[in-house]
């Protein structure tokens, strides 16, 4: 806190300080000298010297000045000399008080008054407790009262709460019952592994008869031994309260409240927060801390000898806490989290509304608050990126809806041999839509030279890749930077070079294909429309992609049709480092979604985990899931409501859809 105007009359001279040293032995020639000397000594904390300028008992006056500083737990005290009125041997001085109540508390400014009388020793302050504050009587003391707000909820789009209210034990003290405040608070802090200083600051200035909550711990983490040890400290007590702490879904997105990880709400918090307050550590809990927590009401009060409030001398009203509305849909979110239990390793699922880009669900298999790769991950999209490059081919004129896009068994391009996932080929009717249907990498790679890196990048940008989405939480829109060279451009056409995406960015691409317009994502409606405008796409070109995606599900992933309705989508596997990425990106009705499973490459020939999770997700949306999803199944154990097959898409062991043997040579289909 920067020095206030007291510096003005402190600077009025070092001569005043010298005068203060002499005045104790010589009569004060004017009331102003007495007032200045008294205020300077009081401000500097030299209470014995200050008491000498009064007509009161020096020990009692010094104690009263010391008590005021401790009762308010002052960080600093500054004064301004006001007008002095004099009538004969009497005078009255006004002075401005600037009392800094400490970190997290406001500054108390008020006007004080002190009467003076001329006597044998010159001018002296006529002492009474009203010198401390005009409204303070002899039998009263000062205190600071602090009342915090109940933490607000985070709600889904239908107003359903997304944060669980936990039973919390508040460890605190009744200051009046403590034999020694510093010793008792320090013992409690050591017992609970906390820093004692912020707790002491709270206790020193608090009304002594009121319970002061200092540290919160989840009820499940408090046992009889801990309660017993705490109860042996004089003045310590506990109370049970309910606090909105734990995210019931999407931990990385909602975030945790301070102390969640260690089952304790820490007093070591930044900003205008007190010991015992709740503070969001990450996610929406952190971003919207002020809205969710509000701010406490602080009052400077006078207390009688029984510790009862006699008057409120100053009050600073806090701001009310409130709820945060999100675009999440609790039922869709539960379906997403339940679906990821089919993934043996880590995985992500993001669902958005096709017409608006509003985020309906964001889930990670790990369930960790630190695992936000559903939004921030940087992954190769594999052939799911064909949704983008197919449009680039159409927009650049490299292909038309009716033109043939040859898809042989393999193609040598720039030193790399491109093959189809299943080793097959399209021998006739090799349109662009059918290349999409059967994930024909050879056909897409062959278009690269005509499409070119600029067209790929331009189309990707129009579908939000690389844009600044301006969500309240960290998110990656991906990037596209295709290097020159036939091989690089061909690899970019199948999402294996120069492009990185997140599951969120792919879900938005699927939404654009479904709706005809790309929309920036929205998570918290109150933030207003996203400044990034919508991008309208060519509907005739989109129809080619939609046809390919619809037929891909019909021919290669019929298990996704179990819940009825029209499902569109593409599946892919791509190696990134030592991880096999399994993708499914598609949409049904007004929900677009992207599933990414990070798998051991050794499991590639066993199961297409993203498609299995997609099937479970669609089933969960259609039929619902339990409120608490079953634990993850690391062994691939089937979750009730999930798909009934563990085979991958298009495995040659079983024909999964109507195919024409003349179209596909070498395998039943080109899917995998």
Residues covered by each model-derived region:
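Beta-lactam-recognizing serine transpeptidase/beta-lactamase-like catalytic domain environment
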Residues: 304-313, 345-378, 382, 392-599, ...
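Exposed beta-sheet edge and beta->alpha loop/turn motif
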Residues: 86-146, 548
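Conserved, well-ordered alpha-helix/loop/beta-strand core segments that scaffold catalytic motifs
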Residues: 305-347
């Amino acid at each position: 806190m920067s020095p206030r105007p007291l510096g003005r009359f402190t600077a009025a001279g070092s001569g005043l300080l010298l005068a203060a040293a002499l005045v104790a032995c010589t009569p004060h020639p004017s009331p102003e000298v007495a007032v200045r000397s008294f205020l300077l000594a009081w401000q500097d904390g030299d209470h014995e010297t200050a008491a000498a300028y009064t007509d009161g008992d020096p020990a009692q006056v010094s104690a009263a000045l010391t008590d005021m500083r401790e009762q308010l737990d002052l960080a600093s005290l500054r004064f301004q000399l006001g007008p002095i009125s004099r009538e004969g041997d009497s005078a009255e001085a006004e002075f401005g008080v600037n009392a800094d109540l400490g970190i997290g508390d406001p500054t108390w400014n008020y006007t004080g008054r002190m009467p003076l009388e001329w006597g044998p020793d010159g001018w002296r302050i006529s002492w009474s407790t009203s010198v401390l504050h005009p409204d303070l009587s002899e039998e009263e003391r000062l205190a600071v009262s602090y009342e915090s707000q109940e933490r607000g909820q985070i709600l889904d789009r239908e107003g359903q709460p997304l944060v669980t209210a936990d039973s919390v034990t508040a460890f605190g003290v009744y200051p009046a019952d403590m034999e020694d405040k510093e010793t008792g608070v320090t013992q409690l802090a050591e017992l609970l592994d906390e820093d004692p200083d912020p707790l002491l600051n709270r206790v020193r200035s608090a009304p002594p008869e009121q319970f002061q909550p200092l540290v919160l711990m989840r009820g499940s983490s408090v046992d009889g031994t801990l309660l017993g040890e705490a109860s042996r400290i004089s003045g310590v007590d506990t109370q049970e309260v309910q606090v909105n702490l734990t995210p019931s879904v999407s931990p990385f997105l909602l975030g945790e409240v301070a102390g969640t990880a260690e089952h304790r709400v820490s007093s070591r918090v930044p900003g205008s927060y007190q010991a015992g307050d709740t503070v969001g550590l990450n996610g929406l809990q952190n971003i919207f801390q002020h809205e969710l927590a509000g701010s406490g009401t602080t009052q400077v009060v006078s207390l009688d000898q029984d510790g009862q409030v006699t008057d409120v001398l100053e009050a600073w009203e806090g701001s009310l806490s409130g709820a945060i509305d999100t675009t999440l849909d609790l039922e869709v979110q539960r379906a997403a989290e339940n679906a990821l239990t089919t993934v043996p390793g880590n995985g992500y699922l993001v669902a958005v509304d096709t017409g608006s880009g509003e985020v309906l669900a964001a889930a990670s298999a790990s369930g960790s608050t630190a695992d936000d790769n559903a939004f921030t991950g940087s992954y190769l999209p594999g052939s799911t990126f064909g949704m983008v490059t197919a449009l680039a081919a159409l927009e650049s004129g490299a292909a038309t809806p009716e033109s043939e896009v040859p898809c042989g068994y393999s193609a040598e391009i720039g030193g790399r041999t491109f093959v189809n996932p299943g080793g097959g080929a399209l021998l006739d009717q090799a349109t662009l839509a059918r290349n999409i249907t059967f994930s024909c990498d050879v056909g897409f790679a062959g278009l690269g030279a005509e499409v070119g890196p600029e067209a790929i990048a331009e189309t990707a940008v129009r579908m939000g890749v690389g844009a600044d989405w301006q969500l309240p939480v960290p998110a990656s829109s991906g990037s596209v930077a295709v290097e020159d060279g036939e091989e690089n451009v061909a690899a970019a056409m199948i999402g294996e070079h120069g492009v990185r995406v997140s599951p969120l960015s792919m879900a938005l691409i699927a939404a654009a294909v479904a709706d005809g317009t790309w929309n920036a994502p929205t998570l918290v409606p109150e933030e207003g429309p996203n400044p990034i405008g919508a991008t309208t796409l060519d509907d005739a070109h989109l129809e080619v992609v939609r046809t390919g995606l619809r037929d891909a599900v019909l021919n290669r992933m019929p298990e996704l049709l179990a819940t009825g309705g029209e499902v569109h989508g593409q599946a892919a596997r791509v190696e990134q480092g030592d991880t096999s990425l399994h993708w499914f990106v598609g949409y049904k009705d007004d929900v677009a979604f992207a599933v990414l499973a990070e798998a051991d490459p050794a499991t590639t020939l066993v199961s297409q985990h993203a498609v299995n999770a997609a099937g479970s997700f669609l089933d969960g949306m259609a039929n619902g899931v339990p409120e608490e999803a079953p634990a993850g199944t690391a062994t691939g154990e089937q979750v009730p409501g999930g798909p009934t097959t563990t085979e991958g898409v298009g495995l040659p062991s079983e024909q999964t859809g109507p195919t024409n043997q003349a179209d596909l040579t070498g395998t039943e289909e080109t899917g995998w």
